Amino acid sequence: MSDLRVVLVGGDEALEEWRYVHNVVVPPAAMSFEEAGERLKRGYRLENVYDGDVLVGCSTVRPVVDGVVTLIARVLPEFRRRGFGAALYEHVLAYARVQGAEVVETCVLGVNEDGLRFARRYGFAEVERYVLDGESDEWVDLRLAL
């Protein structure tokens, strides 16, 4: 990790990059460009992460509600275990704290062992495992009190 940059999504090209990372990391929840844009309209903070000019990940921070924030940090598989996830997580966590978060929630695809291990390493506790109606993929909700 040499030149980490976290950049707020602004404009179509950045949104498409965010969507690309999201869809690679979470294929069962792959979304269209329009669906990604809806997240911005809902007030979600979307950011892309670069090592220099190379896209390595993205993040989502939902608005804080009643002291609870949902944040998700995603790193492309070929860039994992290099410190990008840790740096991104610290970045979004700092933002969430400034927004008044007292509790952090995240959601990880059940087969994403790297993501589950990462969340547990940072103190997240599993809250629930579930499969959405009409789907077959298992999701894991995790929570951390700040």
Enumerate the language-model features and the residues they cover.
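Short coil/loop residues immediately preceding or within conserved phosphate-binding loops
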Residues: G43-Y44, V56, D66, T70, ...
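Conserved acetyl-CoA-binding loop-helix of GNAT-fold acetyltransferases
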Residues: R81-A94, V98, R117-R121
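A short, internal acetyl-CoA/4′-phosphopantetheine-binding micro-motif in the GNAT/acyltransferase core
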Residues: I72-R81, V108-L109
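Glycine-rich phosphate/pyrophosphate-binding loop shared by adenosine-nucleotide-utilizing enzymes
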Residues: S2-L4, G52-C58, V69
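Active-site rim helix/loop that mediates acceptor-substrate recognition in acyltransferases
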Residues: H22-T60
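Conserved catalytic-core motifs of GNAT/GCN5-like acyltransferases
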Residues: C107-L109, R120-D141
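Conserved GNAT acetyl-CoA-binding A-motif
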Residues: A96-G110
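Short amphipathic alpha-helix that is part of the acyltransferase structural core
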Residues: M1-M31, V140-A145
